[in-house]
Amino acid sequence: MILLISDLHLQEERPDITRAFLDLLDGRARHAKALYILGDFFEAWIGDDAMTPFQQSICQAVRQLSDSGTAVYLMHGNRDFLIGEGFCKAAGCTLLADPSVISLGGEQVLLMHGDTLCTRDIGYMKMRRYLRNPLSLWILRHLPLATRQKLARKLRSESRAQTRMKATEIVDVTPEEVPAVMAAHGVKTLVHGHTHRPAIHKLVVNGEPARRIVLGDWDRRGWTLQVDAQGFQLEPFEFS
């Protein structure tokens, strides 16, 4: 069994989500061969050198899962792209490139966070290119802690405001981008998060049936994609 999740946006202000995640680690994830976290694991991340006690506790919990024998893979999201090898080493997880193709359920599957599929959101894509530039990343990681904290708050506030103002289709994936990316990677299944619109979409890639599986965000409930002998099962669950 393989589990895939994304968009938990873990933060101290949402202890219900934290409890649900820790319950998953102590439960189903212990029986999984691997757990994939496809971005926005944390609501914000300003550097491995600035972990709060809360973030350290999550790191330790992931480490316990890894030590129990479940492989853990972590992909950057738009909220936590400053997570580095320091955190991953401490947590016992592997940083996964976005995009990545893995063998899953007997086929090659493309994994992405999903933000790069939203090409109609021109403002966001421009900001993303700037922030992910290696020079920008180096500068961000070396800014004083107080400056990074202030910048993170500003970016989150602006992101929320802009998302509310933008049309739904702009902040969702660009329909023609999806089959193009899938064809470029030679896959018939794509799994991603980011849009907070959980669903399994049928489409055609290179004249053949294909599917796009969108993971759900953890807010009013949690979501997992379980891959086992029965196939790909996208399921919500209520917080206890």
UniProtKB/Swiss-Prot annotation:
UniProt GO cellular component terms: cytoplasm; extrinsic component of plasma membrane
InterPro entries for the chain: Calcineurin-like_PHP_ApaH, LpxH-like, Metallo-depent_PP-like, UDP-diacylglucosamine_Hdrlase
Entry binding sites for Mn(2+) 2: D40, N78, H113, H194
Recorded metabolic or biological pathway in which this protein acts: Glycolipid biosynthesis; lipid IV(A) biosynthesis; lipid IV(A) from (3R)-3-hydroxytetradecanoyl-[acyl-carrier-protein] and UDP-N-acetyl-alpha-D-glucosamine: step 4/6
Catalytic activity: UDP-2-N,3-O-bis[(3R)-3-hydroxytetradecanoyl]-alpha-D-glucosamine + H2O = 2-N,3-O-bis[(3R)-3-hydroxytetradecanoyl]-alpha-D-glucosaminyl 1-phosphate + UMP + 2 H(+)
Binding site residues for Mn(2+) 1: D7, H9, D40, H196
Membrane spanning residue stretches: none
SUPFAM superfamilies recorded: Metallo-dependent phosphatases
GO biological process: lipid A biosynthetic process
Primary site of residence: membrane
tRNA processing as UniProt keyword: no
UniProt similarity note: Belongs to the LpxH family.
Protein name: UDP-2,3-diacylglucosamine hydrolase
Naturally occurring in which organism (per UniProt): Pseudomonas putida (strain W619)
Lineage, broadest ranks: Bacteria, Pseudomonadati, Pseudomonadota, Gammaproteobacteria, Pseudomonadales
GN (gene name): lpxH
